[in-house]
Curated annotation (Swiss-Prot):
This is Ureidoacrylate amidohydrolase RutB. Transmembrane segments: none annotated. Keywords: Hydrolase. The keyword RNA-binding does not apply. It catalyses: (Z)-3-ureidoacrylate + H2O + H(+) = (Z)-3-aminoacrylate + NH4(+) + CO2; (Z)-3-ureidoacrylate + H2O = (Z)-3-aminoacrylate + carbamate + H(+); (Z)-2-methylureidoacrylate + H2O + H(+) = (Z)-2-methylaminoacrylate + NH4(+) + CO2.
Amino acid sequence: MTTLTARPEAITFDPQQSALIVVDMQNAYATPGGYLDLAGFDVSTTRPVIANIQTAVTAARAAGMLIIWFQNGWDEQYVEAGGPGSPNFHKSNALKTMRKQPQLQGKLLAKGSWDYQLVDELVPQPGDIVLPKPRYSGFFNTPLDSILRSRGIRHLVFTSIATNVCVESTLRDGFFLEYFGVVLEDATHQAGPEFVQKAALFNIETFFGWVSDVETFCDALSPTSFARIA
């Protein structure tokens, strides 16, 4: 068992019965010219987050944790996004951006597009699981719950973008399904101003889970290896 120093208190878990979840580290969310950038969100400080995710993934894999990668998006015709009868049609900033800029239709979060692809620095390895998801939460209309339960996994460590949207949504849904969720705060980034990052982390550590950081996580998994991994 491993004890991880976290807020509001330490949490103990078995790495081999836990998963590291990388949420939507796609060009859409982390790269200039991607959806968030085109929609007016600041992605200029995502590079350190990518590096921290690399470090966390390396440590988690070495400790025997399952690595799960999510890619958010829809088919090229956006049928999976829902039509006017879906609130997603009205609230998705990607869909709204394409309605305002028709030349982007078919380019944002469409499966097979550059926007949909994971960033170059983050590459799933054999044994990892890659899942598409059509909404903010990784539990909605995906096999995530059955994948985890079939492996006896109850502890989930979250990284990625956006803390206040897909990361928090997935962690909250996991909480309702009796999963223990931890966020590595320096391996996440918000969509919006800095205060929403702080608000999301406050919500998580106060109501739904735990908050730690990459160095503490790596040191808990293997106290002598963090310097080498980093």
